[in-house]
Amino acid sequence: MNKRDELIGLCIDFLAKVKDKTANANIERWLNENYGPDSETYQKISTLVIDGVAEGWAANDEISGPHYRRSRLCEPCAETFYFSITAVYMDSKGHELDNQQRTFRGDYHSHPYGELNMVIPLDEGAVLAGPLGWQGAGWTAPAPGSQHYPEVKNGALIAFFFLPAGRISYDFQAQG
C-alpha cells in the first residue's frame, strides 16, 4: 500500500467516527479535545499529509504560485461516507497582505454543508484563521453556510479538510 492509500484509509477510519456530526464551534472544540495534535489520529494523518506535500502528491496544484497550492485527494464516495478529502498548502512568508496581522489570504469561498479542517503547521507559530480565532496545530470547523477567506500568518501550514458531499463554492463575493 502506498502512502496516499494509507492516508485515505486513516481518513476513512476517522470519518467513520465523525460522519454524523455537523461542523460548528462545539464540534471544533470537540475535535481539538478528542483528535488534537497529541492524538494518535492527528499524528498519523498529519505525518502522511506532510509527506504527501513534500513528495508532490498532495497540495500539488498551484493556485497563485508555489505558496498557495491545493489538490483533492479523494472525491466523495460511499467509502468516505460522502466526504471529499482535500489538502491545501499556504505560506504567508513573502506574500503577506498590507494589514495589521500580516496575513496571506486564499480564495474567498463558502461551505454549503460546513467543513472539518485539520490544521497542520509546517513553520513554528504558523496559524490559520478559524471560527474560534487563530488555530495552530488542531482543528477548525466552519459551520454550514459559512463564508470566509482561508487566512494564514507566521509561515507555512497545510489545511487538510473534509467536506460533506465535497461541497465548496467560490461563487461568492466577500462582504465588506
UniProtKB/Swiss-Prot annotation:
Pfam families: PnbB
Catalytic activity entry: 4-hydroxylaminobenzoate + H2O + H(+) = 3,4-dihydroxybenzoate + NH4(+)
InterPro entries: PnbB
GO-annotated molecular function: ammonia-lyase activity
Domain of life assignment: Bacteria
Keywords annotated in UniProt: Lyase
The protein's Enzyme Commission number: 4.3.3.-
Family: Belongs to the PnbB family.
Role this protein plays: Lyase involved in the degradation of nitroaromatic compounds. Catalyzes the conversion of 4-hydroxylaminobenzoate to 3,4-dihydroxybenzoate (protocatechuate). Required for the catabolism of 4-nitrotoluene.
UniProt protein name: 4-hydroxylaminobenzoate lyase
Annotated source species: Pseudomonas putida
Gene: pnbB
